[in-house]
Amino acid sequence: MVNIVINQEIEFLEEKSAWQGVKRVAGYVRNDMEKVFGKKPAICAGDSPKSQTVILYGTIGKSKRLDMLESAGKLELSGVRGKREVYLFQVVENPMEGVKSALVIAGSDKRGTIYGLFYLSEKLGVSPLVNWNHVLPKRREYVILTEKDSFVSKEPSVKYRGFFINDEWPAFGTWADKHFSGINAACYECVFELLLRLKGNYLWPAMWASNFNLDGPGLKSAELADELGVVMGTSHHEPCMRAGAEYGKMRGEDSPYGDAWSFLTNEDGITNFWRDGLIRNRSFENVITMGMRGENDTAILGADATMEDNVNLLRRVLKTQNQLIRETINENLDEVPRIMVLFTEVEAFFYGDEKTKGLLDEPELEGVTLMLSDNNQGAARTLPTKAMRNHKGGYGMYYHMDMHGGPMAFEWIGSTYLPKLWEQMTAAYEFGVQEIWVTNIGDIGTQEYGLSFFLDLAYDIGKWGGRDAAITKEYTKKWLRTQFAACFEESILSRMTEALWDYNRLLARRKHEVMNERVYHPVHFFEAEDVLRCCEKLLNTAKEARRACPIEMLGAFVSLFYFPVCGTANLMKMWILAGRNKLYAKQNRMEANDLADEVLACIKADKEYVKDYHEIDDGAFYGFGLSKHIGFRDENWNDENCQYPLRTYAYPADEPRMIVAKKNDEHYLTGGFWCERPLVWRDAMRKDVSEIAFEIACGSEKEVQYEIHTDCPWLHFSKKQGTVAKTEHITVTIDKSQLKGKETGKFFVKNVGYGEAEIHIEAEEEKKYPSGYFLWDNGRVAMDAGHYTAKKDVKNTGFLRMAERTRR
């Protein structure tokens, strides 16, 4: 069997004719191999390598060595030639004189070769996040590849796959300033490398206060993108390769671009601005954004403008832009990738209304990829109808993993729930959205988990599309082991996988910014208790794993796991405790004061987790944790007037005060002498309930001495007397075998010397019910969606239960 030993002695055969970007990526891979083997492999630029084993890489049409190997019958390149972003990965015996074996990486084009080179790194155990998150690979002496490792890659499922760096201040911008003195070409080299390692190829650059084509300095960032094969675009409101902030730098009364961002009053100036942008970037590989919005990502016309006004203006804009592209880039518009993003009010202008025909079927949009969008919260707004799917230019999706805007901003720790992402994007693909996928990734930092899945899904929908969302659990397990299999035992990795999933699921219910003390009721249905238990488990798992983490992997561990998990769990815990503090203070429980102190501890911990994230690895991730994330108010979508939870302290009563309450009910008794009616607990009317947990709490400076009395033979208590300074937890057990029909049992909790609380428990003897029978509980009946009596699928259409998408 043909094989090759990959180690530090292997040589890279480099051809002068190779793409410069491919050579640069080969350098990245050599650096990866140094991390694996301890020494960087040498480069041979001639025809006489010193080693008998070599890595021969090249692009079909730009490599004489590949031509020679094909002519000699050593390679079969027909499965690669002419394809999009495809590579051959093959072990070849005796490829040239003096060489025993070679690993050949042959790309159909520049990006195909680059993906093939990075695939080699992955085969050696190198994570795509090796440089972005400092994920160190396991050290090895060698890796053996055989002819069984040879294969030809598939064409990517989605043509353009990428992300949008958006809302970049204070997080990404601060990080870039610290490490690169700005969002410049040096900064973008790190971003481009990450994008390509994740098998993406398309980028919308940062644009809040950044100018991709000016801050390189100059065009250096654009030139580097083109060198590396990264296709550049601009966001939904930045037409003709112009950054949104550029116009503000160039406008003026004496400017050729005029002094008004208005196609109505300054058509010539805006046209000149677009023309010069197209000319400046025409030598690079771009996808050109079409259309127009108002300044700073606002509506193009005022509130008084009609649908007809807006649609007619956009028709003029599109006609002008297409003409400019013909004049400056290519007369054949079909050869120029273009998009129009149907986002915010532009979506309405596309579809029109009952009075005004929209831009649907507009001739100027022929050949333009129509970018649909989600609702800013991860749910696709529209998908192409069957009649729309033949649109020349195809469809794309603009998806938010970060949002600075309504209905509520979320910009801190990555909060995209993988099963929802899977559901939305696989549905989009099935409806023909296959040309472009781009996600608003915000600051990149802490989004790596969700971003990895988004781009892997776009690259190979066949592998990760699957039949249902359960495949996202498999992905989570694989992703975590890609990062940490080299440094943790399987038992710890299993707990980390569960924790990563649970943290992600918590955020599917409520994101950080909009969590508050009202979301989960402090006692109803034990929902707050369940969340609190989950948070404590997450914190314990993360801290246990940190103790086992090698010091050289702490940067990767903290950035990819510890900070997202602990930051999220601590925040959720803080709000749960705040809700409980508020309720208990209202009841005057002394435990409320302890809870107030615990809330304060969580507030301090929140700051400590961010500080730890920023300081780890000599500040490698400094800035990524800066976004505001706590207590966004209902009246604002953003962080204006946001606040940490309020803490309430209870002042102790003068005399011993007792509070008796069921654990899942806010109603309580104090046992006072006047006007108190008994509490009635009906939990035991349920077939599956034979125990009720309740609490005896102290609401005074003096301790409460209590006694429990009952004449009911079927009520049994875990404890019947004691002294309480804070809270006593007691369980009453109902022996249903003694019941005959429905009965009511009474018991009394005595605050010795100060009163008595009376409790009634309603219970019913055990009954047998037929399968599929639903029981009332306190006036409610619960039926899960999976409790259907019949389900009939028709052809390829039907209902599929997705357990991962439930809230429970």
What are these regions (language model features)?
Residues 196, 201-204, 214, 220, ...:
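Structured mid-domain segments that build the active-site/substrate or prosthetic-cofactor binding neighborhood
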Residues 771-807:
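Glycan-recognition and processing domains
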Residues 104-107, 166-185, 201-213, 250-270, ...:
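The substrate-binding groove and active-site-proximal loops of carbohydrate-active enzymes
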Residues 38, 138, 142-146, 216-219, ...:
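Gly/Pro-rich turn-and-neighbor structural signature
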Residues 699-731:
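Surface-exposed binding patches on compact interaction domains or structured appendages
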Residues 694, 730, 740-755, 759-761:
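A short beta-strand micro-motif common to beta-rich folds, especially ectodomain repeats
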Residues 527-695, 746-747:
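Histidine-centered catalytic/metal-binding microenvironments
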Residues 1-154:
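Contiguous, structured surface segment used for ligand recognition
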